[in-house]
Amino acid sequence: MSSFKFIPKKILLLGSGELGKELVVEAKRLGLEVIAIDKYENAPAMQLADNSFVIDMSDKEILKKKIKELNPDFVVPEIEALSIEALKELEDEGINIVPNARTVEITMNRDKIRDLASKELNIKTAKFSYVFNVDELEIKSSEIGFPLLIKPLMSSSGKGQSLVNRKEDLLLAWNDALKNSRGKIVGVILEEFLNFDYEFTLLTIRKTSGENIFCEPIGHEQYKGDYQCSWQPLDMNQSLINEARKMTTKILNNLNGSGIYGVEFFVRGKEVIFSELSPRPHDTGMVTLVSQNINEFELHLRAFLNLPIPNISLLKPSATRVIISDKESNTPSYSGLNEALELENTKVLIFGKPTAKKGRRMGVVLSTDDDLNIARENADKSALKIKIVS
């Protein structure tokens, strides 16, 4: 009989959105104490956490003071908008940052993760260039070629991303990128617009032993860089899956922190092209709440808590479709829920965000079926029935 005893830990969640909320659900199943932090009151994860605080996580001293005061066993970032300097200093003092402060820093900056993948590890990416001065914009753009994408060096959920087809639109895209940029860096990344066949997420669990475990690829679609729908399994050639796993292993061997990673790729013909990486549960991975025997949130916890991870298996073909607000509201409510839930094997998750904004993700539909096409159709139909009302 094993002498190992699991002792419940205190987890501090930095960022309390919908992904954090599901992480809290799984953490509470394991008897963990969870404290949630965000910049606004009543964020989704706060509604389930043992305690919560509203602070400016981008302020180094404020963040350091609060973390020291709470003295958690693990600090688990869920967002990019936080002081990396605070995390690095706290890690040096012995605080456990998940997966580690270096990884959080690299993945929150598009230039750092792109340089690591392309220049240091020689992993195939789209052509790219950095621009830190508006006077360089036209020259660098001509080197990449049109159409191209302009993105802030630091942002999330597709904010500030633009597809530019001609040089006359460069300045507008530049201004939009800077307006939606996080952090203090004034700069953008110009990226070749790939005419890809499809894109996917490879959820990868990095154990404390250094072993990598791969979930089945998740197909997804985005609009302006923001997730719209996802499905699992994805019908793709095994040789392409193997290539994506090889690339992922190279990156994670360099980053070397335990937890789950959402690694995004494009496929163009027989090419697999690295896109982005998040060191935490991924929005496209919400499909695993119904598609896998162990969902991505529980996998994240098991990985950094050094708990066993047995075989990960697919339960049934599954799909998601997000519920997007088309209006502003300080007291959002929802119509169409009855009709949405009439479809078989379909669930609706309302995130519980206290306010609605145009384009804001307010919920997600999860659907399963023996036929993946039917699962996707039902997720789409159900999501269309739900409307945000004031």
Curated annotation (Swiss-Prot):
Which family is this sequence assigned to?
A: Belongs to the PurK/PurT family.
Binding of ATP, residues: 110, 151, 156-161, 191-194, 199
**Which keywords label this protein?**
ATP-binding, Ligase, Magnesium, Metal-binding, Nucleotide-binding, Purine biosynthesis
Question: Could you tell me which species this protein originates from?
Answer: Prochlorococcus marinus subsp. pastoris (strain CCMP1986 / NIES-2087 / MED4)
**E.C. number(s) listed in UniProt:** 6.3.1.21
Q: Which residues bind N(1)-(5-phospho-beta-D-ribosyl)glycinamide?
A: 18-19, 78, 283, 353, 360-361
Which amino acid positions bind Mg(2+), per UniProt?
264, 276
**Subunit structure, as described in the record:** Homodimer.
Q: In which pathway does it act?
A: Purine metabolism; IMP biosynthesis via de novo pathway; N(2)-formyl-N(1)-(5-phospho-D-ribosyl)glycinamide from N(1)-(5-phospho-D-ribosyl)glycinamide (formate route): step 1/1
| Role, per record | Involved in the de novo purine biosynthesis. Catalyzes the transfer of formate to 5-phospho-ribosyl-glycinamide (GAR), producing 5-phospho-ribosyl-N-formylglycinamide (FGAR). Formate is provided by PurU via hydrolysis of 10-formyl-tetrahydrofolate.
A single GO molecular function, which one? magnesium ion binding
Domain named ATP-grasp: which ranges? 115-305
- Intrachain disulfide bonds: none
**What is the protein name for this chain?**
Formate-dependent phosphoribosylglycinamide formyltransferase
